[in-house]
Structures are given as structure tokens and as C-alpha cells.
């Protein structure tokens, strides 16, 4: 089942967060959902060169919060923050409400080569430049391994290298445990438009397992401490800055 279902959808609330965080009654819910889709489409088309990994949207009363995860924040922010104002006015025009308060937060992706969407975007760019797909996949795997990922799976489907019959090929390096719900799996898809048609790209990145605090593994050679009943928890107060 883990290989059939969407890796992100099955892990929502466990290791993944919702991309849209808001509540609305049943009458306005479809309108706000379409509004989110228009905002994401507008941002992805406007900032193609910014390497946007994800767009998170939150709503609080009349305020709209948009968080952009990007590999190149300077492209969005612009000189002296002029790009933020341009983006804010563009979002207000897209949703058709010039008076809506829009708050924008730009977050830089620390490890670009460990992000599934940015890896898929890199593969799509190379395929559109007519680079052989096996060479492209090998280069993407090397970049991800240098970034320190624990596992990676890449699948490319379509008329590979201009073949008459479409097929799909995939490769995997390391562990990609799709059945383990506590495994942090970053999943993304991308479409590459080539002269022979479109190629579908899927990328799975395994970044580790997220364990609850009570299930954290003990250090090697240590044993669990015995319970001493309902002992009062110790409290420590930092007084290092007090004058003597």
C-alpha cells in the first residue's frame, strides 16, 4: 500500500504538514481552495528562476500569510525589498481583493540538493537541454548523496531518448521506506517538455525517521534509569548574569 498511495498525503499530521492552514464553512471552502491554487500558480509562473520548492498558505481572519521556500531568495526579495511589494500587489490582483492584508515570508532552502522538488526541477532542465536521461539521473543522485540524504529514488517515464515506445525507468540509492509512516519522505513530481513529447519525473527523498521524544534511542552503553516514584521534577534557574 505504501507504494500506491501519495507519500505526502499518508504522512500528513505525522511527519508532513498541510500546505494550506485555514478553516472555512462549506459555502466558502471551495472558493478559498481555488484561491490558493491561483496564488500558487501565479507565484510558480512569475518566479521560474527563483527555484521555489513550496508555497505554504495560512489564513487568519482577514489576513493572508504566504510562505515561500526558495533556493534563491534574492530573486524574490529584490533590491531593498522592492520585490516583496510587487509580489504582494500581484497576489492581491490574483485574488481580486486589493484591500486584503497579505503577509509574505521568504525562507531559504538550506540544502538545495536534498529537496525533492528542486532535484526534479534540475532533472527536467537537463532533459529539456537534451542531456541523456541516465547521465542526468546519475548526476542528480551524486548531488543528493553529497547533500547527505539517506535514500533517493528517481523515476522518469515517457519517450526516453526519443524512443518510439514510451517506457519508464527508475533507480534507487540507499533506503526509501515508503511503508514506514514515521519516515520523513520528501516527494515531488515535475514534467519536462522535450522535442519528442513530455517526460514525467518523480523523486522520493528519504531524510530520516522522526521519533517521538519518549522513543528516542539511548546512547550506546547506557541503560534506562529506574523510576523513583512521583519524584518532584528539578528546576534550574540561570543566575549567571546576576551581579555578585
From Swiss-Prot:
Coiled coil stretches, renumbered: none
SUPFAM superfamilies named among the record's database cross-references: Prokaryotic type KH domain (KH-domain type II), Ribosomal protein S3 C-terminal domain
CDD domains linked to this entry: KH-II_30S_S3 (cd02412)
Pfam families the record matches: KH_2, Ribosomal_S3_C
SMART domains documented for this protein: KH
Stretches for region Disordered: 214-244
PROSITE patterns in alphabetical order: KH_TYPE_2, RIBOSOMAL_S3
Ranges of compositional bias, category Basic and acidic residues: 234-244
Statement: the UniProt record of this protein carries the keyword Transcription: no
One annotated GO molecular function: structural constituent of ribosome
Gene Ontology CC annotations of this record: cytosolic small ribosomal subunit
Domain KH type-2 as annotated: residue spans: 39-110
Assembly description: Part of the 30S ribosomal subunit. Forms a tight complex with proteins S10 and S14.
Role, per record: Binds the lower part of the 30S subunit head. Binds mRNA in the 70S ribosome, positioning it for translation.
HAMAP family named among the record's database cross-references: Ribosomal_uS3_B
Entry-linked PANTHER family: 30S/40S RIBOSOMAL PROTEIN S3, SMALL RIBOSOMAL SUBUNIT PROTEIN US3C
Family the UniProt entry places it in: Belongs to the universal ribosomal protein uS3 family.
Protein name according to UniProt: Small ribosomal subunit protein uS3
The species this protein was found in: Prochlorococcus marinus (strain NATL1A)
